Amino acid sequence: MKIAVPKEIKNHEYRVALTPSGARELVGRGHDVIVQAAAGEGAGFSDADFEAAGARLEADVAKLWDDAELILKVKEPQAEEVARLSAGQTLFTYLHLAAEESLTKGLLDSGATCIAYETITAPEGGLPLLAPMSTVAGRMAVQAGAHSLEKAQGGAGILLPGVPGVAPARVTVIGGGVVGENAARMALGLGAEVTVLDKSIPRLETLDDRYQGRMKTVFSTADALEEAVRESDLIIGAVLVPGAAAPKLITRDMLSDMKPGSVLVDVAIDQGGCFETSKPTTHAEPTYVVDGVVHYCVANMPGAVARTSTQALTNATLPFVVALADKGWQKALADDDHFAAGLNVHDGKLTYRAVAEAFGLEYVEAASLIG
């Protein structure tokens, strides 16, 4: 199979969808891996690295896309990339369609088969292709929040761990999943006072046991959120409704209760954000201020640590890429119900219910198309 790996074009996105090691595995199975020239440079992988792995380089972007049967990406396709897709091609990447109606309609119009990393499930539960980037994003959220608390960044001028005689920052993490746990773990390690809010008592029990009571665990209610808003120096939104838009948990009105110079980091921005005042930002201009509260809403946080992220992503995606390349999308998904959960769009049909409901579009059962 002809497998194309384009260079990511989203603002400050330095990751690449495949490492040279991953390319070598695919080439060894008889597949033709075509990598856009310079695609891996941002992640520290040279063209020579890919050539040594047996991949071919292609400088002509149009030819790369036109010749491809399977296209591997990291971020959702940008407008010019959607225009390059055609019927018969398979796109495998993060899509996050519930936050992007125009992208959803563009992919439907393309006629391509689009499989989303983030909606693939695992037999033991969880989202195996979202987890590695969620781990990175959770840890980065604390770094970003700590930096945003600095006075020069518009923050209150608070050092996250404090110093002897001065209290540490109060950090609240909304959501105790992969992102939330990694954010809480990072903040705890830096010496902050950490509280995690979640709707799942079993999850809170797990966190309490795992971290031996060193972080507060609180059942998430309206009262708990209001208290967090009043007391926290840094709030990290780590809420996930798989494949659907994130709920707005902190409203514009609630900002008036926050401390001046406090910080909101919205890791859920890929799914529309979990704060009413959130809007996507970039690594070039990561923050803005609303009512005295600093907002950090970068939609591709792991892109800033591209080498780590690319390696972690390829480790997770490669078995699925191998299945697609060896079997074709239809048999690969027919053989694995958990993989089939990743199908979002096929031949002009929308096959992910939460996205269809978000935009009032017709929904078609994926199973009816997989066979």
Swiss-Prot record:
Q: Provide this UniProt record's keywords sorted from A to Z.
A: Magnesium, Metal-binding, NAD, Nucleotide-binding, Oxidoreductase
Gene Ontology molecular-function annotations: alanine dehydrogenase activity; metal ion binding; nucleotide binding
Which GO cellular component terms, listed alphabetically, does the Swiss-Prot or TrEMBL entry include?
plasma membrane
Task: State the CDD domains in the record.
Answer: L-AlaDH (cd05305)
UniProt keyword Cell division, yes or no: no
Cofactor list: Mg(2+)
Leader sequence range is none
InterPro entries, alphabetically? Ala_DH, Ala_DH/PNT_CS2, AlaDH/PNT_N, AlaDH/PNT_NAD(H)-bd, NAD(P)-bd_dom_sf
Q: What is this protein called?
A: Alanine dehydrogenase
